[in-house]
Amino acid sequence: MAALTGLWGSFAHVSRAFSQRCFSTSGSLSAVQKMTRVRVVDNSALGSTPYHRPPRCIHVYNKSGVGKVGDQILLAIRGQKKKALIVGHRMPGSRMTPKFDSNNVVLIEDNGNPVGTRIKIPIPTSLRRREGEYSKVLAIAQNFV
């Protein structure tokens, strides 16, 4: 009887361990994906006016579906759809890529020109390597990190 009780106790312990570890309660730390809240950091009229809902990413224009610095995304902002360029995210990236306090984006037009005339925060120097694509965004940036 004691062996049966010991066996049942170990079974209860194992089943409790499996039930606790079968799922994670913390969110995964990824850069920018669908439904991620972002912060518009240029001085465009659409991004600088307050609104009761923050802008959210509704599509990432790459294969993996996770946007990093330099990727284009589609935003839902104030009831409109606008393209944006990611200039900073919260997830720690590769070496020599800074980690920001928020997911920062710059609004761009369909042809790649920025909507605003000034970027309020420093942007990573890793965007300078992609100068041909985003030369006008780099031209309105004041500081680089």
Curated annotation (Swiss-Prot):
What GO molecular-function term can you cite, just one? structural constituent of ribosome
What SMART domains is this protein classified in?
Answer: Ribosomal_L14
Stretch forming the transit peptide: 1-30
Keyword Transit peptide in the entry? The reply is yes
Going by the UniProt record, its keywords in alphabetical order are:
Mitochondrion, Ribonucleoprotein, Ribosomal protein, Transit peptide
What is a single Pfam family found in this protein's UniProt entry?
Answer: Ribosomal_L14
> What's the stated role of this polypeptide?
May form part of 2 intersubunit bridges in the assembled ribosome. Upon binding to MALSU1, intersubunit bridge formation is blocked, preventing ribosome formation and repressing translation.
Q: How does it assemble?
A: Component of the mitochondrial ribosome large subunit (39S) which comprises a 16S rRNA and about 50 distinct proteins. Interacts with MALSU1.
Stated family: Belongs to the universal ribosomal protein uL14 family.
PANTHER family per UniProt: 39S RIBOSOMAL PROTEIN L14, MITOCHONDRIAL (PTHR21037), LARGE RIBOSOMAL SUBUNIT PROTEIN UL14M (PTHR21037:SF3)
Q: What is this protein called?
A: Large ribosomal subunit protein uL14m
Question: Which organism does this record belong to?
Answer: Mus musculus
